[in-house]
C-alpha cells in the first residue's frame, strides 16, 4: 500500500482541513481536561501511548495541587503504558483510579500505599464492559495516531488496544499526531468494525492468519475532536532484564518442559515468563 506521508513534519500529517483548525500545543490541550474526568488513553505497553499531553497534564496537576488543589483523574488504557504517561501522572499523585493493567513502579507504589484505586480486570474484557456501561462514563479519549487523512480517517500508531472503543465512547477526543512514527504504518492495521455486544455478537469472520476482515484506519466523529497536538517522539521501550528467578520444580533453574511436539504458547509478562521464553531457544525443533 502506498503511504500518504513520507517524512512530513508533525503538522503536515494533519490533512483534514477541519482538524487543522484545532491544532494546539500539549499544554493548551491539557487545559481542556478537568479534575474528576475519566480519560481513555492509547497505549499497549509504551507502544502507541501519547507522549506530550500526559506530561503536560502532569505539569498542570502538579501546579494546581501545589496551590492546595486536589486535581485527579481516572485513567483507562489498553494495557500498561510508559513513564511519559503512567509514570508522569503517578508521580504527581494525579491518578484516582486506574485500569486495566499497569507495570510502572510509581503506579504500583501508589496502589499499594492506598492512594490509587486499581481495577485488575482482564484486558480482553475492558471494551465490552465499557460498552455495557459497567465502568462508568468516559469523558475524554487521548489517542496517538500516525496521521490524519483529508476525510478525517486516522492512521493508527504502533498499537491499537482499546482505541476504537475510546474514540466511539468518549464525549471528547484529543489526538496526538506523532510524526516520529513511521509513515509505513499506514495500511498495516486491520480494524474490524463488524463486532457487536452480546447477545447480538456474531463470530469474527477470520479463519487464517493472513485474512484481513477490516480496514487500515480508525474513524471518529470529527465534531468530538477538541484538540490536535503535533508531536515528534519515539516510543520508549524498556530492555528485557536477565531472568533471575527459580522456577518451582526446575531444580533451581528455569527449564522448559520436554515435549514431543511444539504447542502454541502465549507468553505473558514478568521474570517467570521471560525465563520460560528464553529457554525455548534451547528446545529441539
Cite the ranges covered by each PLM segment.
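Conserved alpha/beta enzyme-core scaffold
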Residues: 1-285
Amino acid at each position: 500500500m502506498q503511504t500518504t506521508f513520507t517524512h512530513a513534519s508533525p503538522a503536515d500529517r494533519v490533512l483534514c482541513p477541519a482538524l487543522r483548525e484545532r491544532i494546539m500545543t500539549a499544554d493548551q490541550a491539557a487545559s481542556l481536561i478537568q479534575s474528576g474526568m475519566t480519560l481513555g488513553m492509547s497505549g499497549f505497553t509504551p507502544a502507541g501511548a501519547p507522549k506530550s499531553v500526559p506530561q503536560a497534564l502532569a505539569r498542570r496537576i502538579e501546579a494546581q495541587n501545589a496551590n492546595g488543589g486536589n486535581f485527579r483523574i481516572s485513567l483507562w488504557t489498553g494495557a500498561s503504558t510508559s513513564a511519559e504517561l503512567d509514570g508522569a501522572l503517578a508521580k504527581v499523585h494525579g491518578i484516582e483510579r486506574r485500569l486495566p493493567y499497569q507495570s510502572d513502579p510509581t503506579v504500583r507504589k501508589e496502589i499499594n500505599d492506598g492512594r490509587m484505586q486499581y481495577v485488575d480486570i482482564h484486558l480482553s474484557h475492558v471494551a465490552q464492559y465499557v460498552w455495557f456501561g459497567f465502568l462508568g462514563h468516559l469523558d475524554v479519549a487521548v489517542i496517538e495516531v500516525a496521521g490524519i487523512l483529508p476525510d478525517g480517517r486516522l492512521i493508527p500508531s504502533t498499537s491499537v488496544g482499546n482505541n476504537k472503543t475510546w474514540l466511539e465512547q468518549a464525549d471528547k477526543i484529543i489526538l496526538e499526531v506523532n510524526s516520529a512514527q513511521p509513515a509505513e504504518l499506514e495500511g498495516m492495521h486491520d480494524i474490524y468494525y463488524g463486532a457487536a455486544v452480546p447477545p447480538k455478537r456474531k463470530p469474527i469472520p477470520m479463519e487464517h492468519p493472513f485474512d484481513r476482515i477490516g480496514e487500515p484506519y480508525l474513524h471518529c466523529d470529527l465534531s468530538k475532536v477538541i484538540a490536535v497536538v503535533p508531536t515528534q517522539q519515539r516510543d520508549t521501550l524498556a530492555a528485557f532484564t536477565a531472568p533471575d528467578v527459580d522456577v518451582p520444580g526446575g531444580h533451581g533453574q528455569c527449564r522448559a518442559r520436554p515435549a514431543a511436539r511444539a504447542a502454541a504458547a502465549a507468553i505473558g509478562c514478568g521474570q517467570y515468563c521471560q525465563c520460560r521464553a528464553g529457554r525455548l531457544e534451547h528446545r529441539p525443533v
